Structure formats: structure tokens, C-alpha cells
Amino acid sequence: MNPVDLIIKRAYPYETEKRDRIYLALNENPFPFPKELTEEVFRKLEGDKMRIYYDSPDEELIEKILEYLDADFLRENNVSIGNGADEIIYVMMLMFERAVFFPPTYSCYRIFAKAVGAKYLEIPLTKYLKIPEVDVGEGDVVFIPNPNNPTGHVFEREEIEKILKKGAFVALDEAYYEFHGESYIDLLKEYENLAIIRTFSKAFSLAAQRIGYVISSEKFIDAYNRVRLPFNVSYVSQTFAKVALEHIDIFKERIEYIVSERERMKKALKELNYSISDSRGNFVFIFMDRKEQNKLIEQLRQKNIAVRSFREGVRITIGKREENETILKELEVFR
């Protein structure tokens, strides 16, 4: 078969929707990147640095990431960056013999595996949302979002270590770390077959700038840097990230707001007798069969509200309070 036809047959595009409504489908931060910080970025940008192939990553950004991580065992050669966390995941699909993941999980794991023609294994989480028994070893990369996406629940440390001890490489996707506040980053001191993936998209309102970072052993980072594209993150994006890290307190205040709204939403949904997960992300997840989902999504569509549907239920991004109130009222009517 023609290679182009083969790709079209096996892979499918990641599709997005118009934003002409209350859009609570992609776990975006409800707050815009602060205007005063955008102005600071523009003041810092230098025309001469625009014309060159800018270092990716630049040393100053790595230093600021290390300061943010506040882990004294990490050094500059333990960190690299990607064009969004997605590029890091995509590159890792190319680095290993097989990808393993546990649905319900981040949909791009499967999308990227199919796009690059990688071997992959999907084994559903148990009914209690635990990682199932799986036969893995060297050559496998196991992708685990923690908190999980789309359910938002957190995996136990023992579940992660069980896979690490089998020799497989674990990519712990901590895209929603800031909304949970706890990390297994200390496991890097014991396991070289572990990488932590983070992003500036969620907590820092920088999804459009496409910048993520990966923390791992010096050996893995060296290998990753050899496979990723050179100059993969723009000078502008790196400058936005550096400025964000210089003003952490602004974002901490916003994170507290989102977490408070998440907990309020969870409480309200329980009072409405919805079955929900214990989400620690910037979203809530309602378990719901397809028939119910279709009815709910149609009702929300008529009210110009978009959420995300999965086989197991519906994920709703935490928006600003008025948006959350609007969807809670619709969920009360639906109930």
C-alpha cells in the first residue's frame, strides 16, 4: 500500500471544535495569561534573537525550571523541553519498541502511536480504576497520567513502582500536577527507567505557546535530545515560560481558585446523585453510559456548552464560577 494511504488508513487526526460557546472540553485554564506579564515578555524580546536558530532549551529556562522543581538531586542535564508535552510523548513513541497505556487515559497516546506506526498495547484500568497486571519489560514505555486524564484520580505510588521494578520505562505524565500538588518526582532518585512529563499549558495559561518539559536521568535526557527536533521550542515560547516562572505567586492564586471550584463542583454533583471520580485535575468526571451521555451532550449543545465525552463518562473542565454555575444548573435539570 502507498505509504500516504497507509497513514490515512491507520491514523486519525486530532479534531477540535469552534469556540463560539462555553467551552469546557479541553481542560484549558479559564484565566488568560496576565496582560502585565505579556507586556513584560514583549519588553524582553530582542529582534536579533528572533533571526537566529535559538537554543532549545536555553540555559536560563532550565535554571528556572530547576528552581521551580526545588529538588536538590536534579541538575541541568536532568531536564529538557518539548513543543508542548505532546511532542515529548510523540518522541518517546519513536524511542521505544512498544507503548503501553491503560484506558480511560489520555487519547493522544493512542493517536500518536498509530500516527508513527508504533506497536502499542492497551489494557483497561480495573473497575476500581487501578493499574491492571501487565507483562512489560525493557523495550516498553508505559504512559501513566497522574492525576489521570480523563478521570482525574491519582494512582498509588506502589502501582507505579510495581511497573518500574519490571524494567519497563515509565513516562509519568504530570500535566495536572499543580492542581494536585503532589508528585512522585523523588522516585527519580531510585529509578533510571522513569521520566516525569510536565507542561506550561494548564496551570500557566500557555497552551497556545506549546511548551512542556521532561525530567529524567542524564542518560535518558541525552537520548531524548538526540531524537527530538533541534530548535524545537521557539524563543518567544521560552521567554513566556521564563516570565511565568518569575511570577509563580500569580499562578498559585489562580490554581487555588480552580481547585476550590473543582471541590465545590464535586460536592454539588454528589448532592445531585451523580457518580463521579475523585478528580485532582482541573476538571470533574461523571461516570455515565453512552445513552445518557448523548442526551446530556445534546441538552448542553442547545445551551451552547461543550464538554468532552468518553466511553466511560463525561469530563467537564473547571471554568470560572459563572460558567460552572451554568453547567451545574443544566446538570440539575438533566437529573
Curated annotation (Swiss-Prot):
So which domain of life are we looking at?
Answer: Bacteria
Q: Which EC numbers does the record give?
A: 2.6.1.9
Give the catalytic activity.
Answer: L-histidinol phosphate + 2-oxoglutarate = 3-(imidazol-4-yl)-2-oxopropyl phosphate + L-glutamate
Q: Which UniProt keywords apply?
A: Amino-acid biosynthesis, Aminotransferase, Histidine biosynthesis, Pyridoxal phosphate, Transferase
Tell me where in this chain the PTM N6-(pyridoxal phosphate)lysine is found: 202
Task: Kindly give the InterPro entries that the UniProt entry links to this protein.
Answer: Aminotrans_II_pyridoxalP_BS, Aminotransferase_I/II_large, HisP_aminotrans, HistidinolP_aminotransfase, PyrdxlP-dep_Trfase, PyrdxlP-dep_Trfase_major, PyrdxlP-dep_Trfase_small
What GO terms describe the biological role, i.e. biological process, of this protein?
A: L-histidine biosynthetic process
GO MF term (any one): histidinol-phosphate transaminase activity
Cofactor(s), by name: pyridoxal 5'-phosphate
**Which pathway, metabolic or otherwise, does it act in?**
Amino-acid biosynthesis; L-histidine biosynthesis; L-histidine from 5-phospho-alpha-D-ribose 1-diphosphate: step 7/9
Q: Which Pfam families match?
A: Aminotran_1_2 (PF00155)
Q: Which NCBIfam families match?
A: hisC
**Family, similarity comment:** Belongs to the class-II pyridoxal-phosphate-dependent aminotransferase family. Histidinol-phosphate aminotransferase subfamily.
Q: How does this chain assemble?
A: Homodimer.
What is the name attached to this protein's record?
Answer: Histidinol-phosphate aminotransferase
